[in-house]
């Protein structure tokens, strides 16, 4: 029932012009800010601590971030309207050569990104630009929501692999075939994550981008989509990362993850209204850290070979 309702809502949303969609999102975002006090207070508290700003400043930015989130949700439902002919009306890209040159090396590309801007449109925009895009995504607690998201992504030609499942084997094959594999690397990584600094605090961080890059010799290209003042979107592509190679694979993995986290932090600092500040990003305390397996063990998992 939820699946049918959401897909019906998507069809209704797709009847609207994009400008009307953004206007509705603005109203819904303000309502969300006023009504959902738990997430609002968590976002304000985390922003004050992370950015070192006053409560009034944080309230202003968080309100704008809730508007951005509401617009994001509507734009996700709007994805069936996007196609190769019209996407350039909504999405621009800078420095695509960082991606095309990296793809030309033949080892696939790991895209490092986060829940910034309308992140679902990032993969869609790259597909319409002619790039072979796949991504790893965390399944939603409600499987019907996951199915809705995956079906909307499929309308734009984006292939999704579920995190924490056997589909990671298919993700590995995608890199072997020279495709792009995207990672949202700004969530809590649990006890098995790398504990690195994020906004001045130790945070468990997913190591997937570093692990897959190391295993398949794939360049890591930080890529983000940012909402612009006119309501459009810019895919912002940074140069490929210089990864560590000290001869200590475990240490290199942690250092690479730390560098990736710093890049995401810098983008958030530059665009604080476009991140999900109510995420439980610092949910796993450092004392829950588990012993990391050697990188080669993780590489075996990526290949489906468990010791």
Describe each model-derived feature in a short phrase:
Residues 38, 93, 117, 143-144, ...:
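Residue-level recognition of alpha-helix initiation/capping sites
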Residues 1-113, 155:
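Membrane-anchoring hydrophobic helices of lipid-metabolizing enzymes
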Residues 28, 50-63, 101-103, 128, ...:
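Non-catalytic C-terminal accessory region of glycerolipid acyltransferases
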Residues 35, 90-91, 114, 141, ...:
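Residues that cap or flank secondary-structure elements
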Residues 86-91, 138, 157-163, 199-200, ...:
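Short, flexible loop segments at the rims of nucleotide/cofactor-binding pockets, characterized by
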Residues 68, 105-165, 171, 191-196:
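Catalytic core of membrane glycerolipid acyltransferases/transacylases, capturing the structured
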Residues 8, 20, 43-46, 122, ...:
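Hydrophobic alpha-helical segments typical of transmembrane helices
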């Amino acid at each position: 029932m939820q699946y049918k309702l959401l897909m019906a809502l998507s069809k209704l949303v797709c009847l609207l012009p994009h400008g009307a969609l953004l206007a509705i999102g603005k109203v819904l975002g303000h309502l969300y800010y006023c009504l959902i006090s738990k997430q609002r207070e968590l976002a304000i508290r985390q922003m004050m601590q992370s950015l070192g700003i006053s409560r009034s400043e944080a309230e202003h930015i968080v309100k704008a971030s809730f508007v951005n989130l509401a617009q994001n949700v509507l734009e996700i439902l709007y994805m069936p309207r996007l196609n190769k002919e019209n996407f350039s009306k909504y999405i621009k890209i800078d420095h695509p050569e960082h991606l095309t040159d990296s793809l030309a090396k033949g080892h696939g590309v790991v895209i490092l990104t986060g829940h910034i801007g309308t992140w679902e449109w990032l993969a869609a925009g790259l597909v319409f630009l002619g790039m072979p895009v796949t991504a790893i995504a965390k399944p939603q607690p409600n499987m019907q929501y996951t199915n809705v998201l995956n079906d909307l992504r499929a309308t734009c030609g984006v292939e999704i692999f579920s995190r924490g499942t056997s589909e990671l084997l298919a993700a590995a094959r995608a890199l072997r075939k020279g495709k792009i594999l995207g990672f949202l690397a700004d969530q809590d990584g649990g006890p098995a994550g790398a504990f690195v600094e994020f906004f001045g605090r130790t945070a468990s961080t997913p190591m997937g981008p570093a692990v897959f890059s190391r295993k398949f010799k794939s360049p890591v290209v930080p890529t983000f989509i940012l909402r612009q003042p006119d309501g459009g979107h810019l895919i912002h592509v940074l140069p490929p990362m210089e990864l560590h190679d000290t001869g200590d694979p475990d240490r290199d993995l942690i250092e690479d993850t730390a560098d990736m986290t710093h890049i995401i932090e810098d983008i958030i600092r530059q665009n604080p209204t476009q991140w999900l500040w109510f995420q439980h990003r610092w949910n796993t305390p450092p004392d829950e850290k588990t012993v990391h397996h050697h990188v080669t063990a993780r590489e075996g998992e990526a290949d489906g070979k468990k010791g």
